[in-house]
């Protein structure tokens, strides 16, 4: 007889897949935004472009939090998935709101940079909405 430890696997439903893809897109956009910011002279270093004063990307701690939260939100265990989904939904709203408080929306950006910023914030809100749908689905089980 061998004892096996249960493993917690992520769910493979379309909503979970969309959440993982959405956070993957956010990470790619964050890195691209940091490179754009660096090449345009908005930030002196790559770490500054990914720091608290970033205009075209999320700060590194937010990116790490989103990866951890999507890992939790896509788990089958409700005890993990419910709070992770709720927090991931909140991060979408925080990403949007932070631009009003940190001067990100008032920054002097070119039209292309502004379009990228709008696309990034929209993607953050989209992931937040997906996380909200995941939360509702979990709470209805």
Where are these regions (language model features)?
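Cytosolic juxtamembrane helix and N-cap/initiation of the first transmembrane helix
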Residues: 1-32, 134-141
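Hydrophobic transmembrane helix segments
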Residues: 22-63
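Alpha-helical transmembrane segments of polytopic membrane proteins
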Residues: 50-66, 95, 112-126
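Loop-to-transmembrane helix junctions at the membrane interface
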Residues: 67-97
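Alpha-helical membrane-associated segments of multi-pass integral membrane proteins
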Residues: 19, 107-140
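Membrane-interfacial loop-to-transmembrane-helix junctions in polytopic alpha-helical membrane proteins
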Residues: 8-18, 47-50, 54, 73-83, ...
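Juxtamembrane "helix-exit" motif on the non-cytosolic side of transmembrane helices
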Residues: 35-44, 97-108
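Alpha-helical transmembrane segments in multipass membrane proteins, preferentially the mid-helix core
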Residues: 62-73, 129-137
């Amino acid at each position: 007889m061998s004892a096996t430890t249960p493993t917690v696997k992520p769910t493979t439903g379309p909503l979970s897949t969309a959440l993982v893809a959405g956070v993957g897109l956010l990470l790619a956009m964050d890195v691209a935004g940091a490179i754009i910011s660096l090449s345009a002279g908005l930030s002196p270093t790559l770490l500054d472009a990914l720091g608290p004063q970033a205009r075209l990307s999320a700060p590194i701690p937010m990116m790490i939090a989103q990866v951890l939260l999507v890992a939790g939100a896509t788990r089958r265990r409700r005890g993990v998935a419910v709070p992770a989904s709720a927090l991931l939904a909140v991060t979408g709203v925080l990403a949007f709101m932070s631009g009003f408080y940190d001067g990100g929306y008032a920054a002097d950006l070119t039209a292309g940079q502004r379009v990228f910023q709008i696309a990034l914030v929209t993607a953050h809100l989209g992931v937040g909405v997906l996380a909200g749908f995941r939360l509702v689905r979990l709470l209805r089980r």
